[in-house]
């Protein structure tokens, strides 16, 4: 089990000079852009390992498409989901469903997939390379045609970001935006140009290995719960 406290970890979002604060701003910009570009009508959003939901809730609080959005945010730590419930209530967002549970399970998303926006923020820093690629493969089932996946990954050496982009692009996604490589944190957005495959009900999309481990097979953290 990971010794990191994922509830107190969110405090860095409140520091304007932190890398996480910058990353949050990037993610929110991509969410706004995806909502701005979404066709008229309902918009479905899935957030994997949603934490306190600051990215999505922070945008929807003031976005003109807020009433069109039905979203499910899945997060393992109940303290974080409690915080997300408070934020959603304060923003008067009844279209958000906040689930305390294992974000790796496809059963959490099957009735809302494929979605117009998929948030995979904080996933890719604690998986093996194989599980990152596997999760991206599942994005072809989670994401609707024309939908967007917003994702994050720190640029540890060796920098895996180019391979992540290649994995997306090899599965029918086109790059919409990528953050400046001069920063340690990275945010990307890829739009799905293919047709979504069916999502199986009982699959496990990924398992976690611990912070900044790309190749080792040993799982040291709980599934569905990391922020790399």
Model-identified regions with their sequence ranges:
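Conserved class I S-adenosyl-L-methionine
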Residues: 39-51
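S-adenosyl-L-methionine
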Residues: 83-111
């Amino acid at each position: 089990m990971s010794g990191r406290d994922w509830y107190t970890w969110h405090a860095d979002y409140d520091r304007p000079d932190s890398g996480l604060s910058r990353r949050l701003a990037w993610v929110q910009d991509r969410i706004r852009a995806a909502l701005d570009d979404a066709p008229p009508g309902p918009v479905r959003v899935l957030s994997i390992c949603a934490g306190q939901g600051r990215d999505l809730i922070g945008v929807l609080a003031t976005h003109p498409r807020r009433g069109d959005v039905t979203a499910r945010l899945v997060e393992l730590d109940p303290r974080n989901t409690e915080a997300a419930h408070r934020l959603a209530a304060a923003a008067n967002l009844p279209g958000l469903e906040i689930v305390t549970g294992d974000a790796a399970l496809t059963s959490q998303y099957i009735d809302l997939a494929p979605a117009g926006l998929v948030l995979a923020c904080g996933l890719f820093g604690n998986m093996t390379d194989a599980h990152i690629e596997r999760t991206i493969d599942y994005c072809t089932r989670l994401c609707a045609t024309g939908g967007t996946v917003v994702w994050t990954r720190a640029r540890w050496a060796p920098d895996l970001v180019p391979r992540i982009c290649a994995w997306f692009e090899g599965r029918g996604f086109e790059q919409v935006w990528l953050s400046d490589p001069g920063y340690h944190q990275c945010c990307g957005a890829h739009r799905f140009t293919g047709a979504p495959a069916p999502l199986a009900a009982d699959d496990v999309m990924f398992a976690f290995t611990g912070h900044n481990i790309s190749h080792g097979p040993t799982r040291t953290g709980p599934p569905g719960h990391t922020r790399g």
